[in-house]
Amino acid sequence: MNLTPREKDKLLISLAAMVARGRLERGCKLNHPEAIALITDYVVEGARDGRAVADLMEAGAHVITADQCMDGIAAMIHDVQVEATFPDGTKLVTVHHPIR
């Protein structure tokens, strides 16, 4: 399987998000990389499904809550920027204050 660096990054994010979902299901709180991966994966998959940029910017801020993260993680993450592929091309999606 020949993957481009971008495709490898997408797979790594997807795997990290799967790990994060499993930890949430077990009642574990998320660390910084897990929180970022979960939000990023949500945006990438939403773009793949054809959702609008504005919709993903808003919905991305409701993927996880501060209670689902370790102490201090929500304060560390001000914005999450994701370069996602939409049906009409690649766009940058910025989720402001993603953990509330």
UniProtKB/Swiss-Prot annotation:
Gene3D superfamilies: Urease, gamma-like subunit. It is an enzyme of class 3 (hydrolase). The gene is ureA. Belongs to the urease gamma subunit family. It comes from Jannaschia sp. (strain CCS1). This is Urease subunit gamma. HAMAP family: Urease_gamma. Pathway: Nitrogen metabolism; urea degradation; CO(2) and NH(3) from urea (urease route): step 1/1. SUPFAM superfamilies: Urease, gamma-subunit (SSF54111). The keyword Hydrolase applies. GO terms for biological process: urea catabolic process. Keywords: Cytoplasm, Hydrolase. It comes from the Bacteria. NCBIfam families: PRK13241.1 (NF009712), urease_gam (TIGR00193). Its EC number is 3.5.1.5. Its main location: cytoplasm.
